[in-house]
Amino acid sequence: PILIFAFVMFAVMVNAKPSIDDAEMKREPKPNIINAPCSGCYYQVGNECVYDKLKCGPVRK
């Protein structure tokens, strides 16, 4: 009985961690919705738009 109890507790602990990660992953896209999606010569890195030199060449001033 002790081994069964330990196995159940282990399974619960292992299953609890991915649910926390899933919650963080689901929470992450929200800032992208607040900020307009990057368009044209920009691509998204985290919550920032970065200029794509390869696609559009040097930055125009």
Swiss-Prot record:
Q: Where in the cell is it found?
A: Secreted; Nematocyst
So what does this one do?
Answer: Toxin that is lethal to crab. Does not produce the typical symptoms associated with sodium channel toxins in crabs, suggesting that it likely does not act on sodium channels.
Bridged cysteine pairs (disulfide): C38-C49, C41-C56
Keyword Signal tagged: yes
UniProt superkingdom: Eukaryota
Q: What is its main location?
A: secreted
Propeptide, chain numbering = 20-31
| Family assignment from sequence similarity | Belongs to the Hau1a/HC18/HC19 family.
Species name: Radianthus crispa (Leathery sea anemone)
**What is the residue range of the signal peptide feature?**
1-19
Query: What's the protein called, per UniProt?
Result: U-stichotoxin-Hcr1b
Give the misc comment. A synonymy between H.magnifica and R.crispa is controversial.
Enumerate the UniProt keywords alphabetically.
Disulfide bond, Hydroxylation, Nematocyst, Secreted, Signal, Toxin
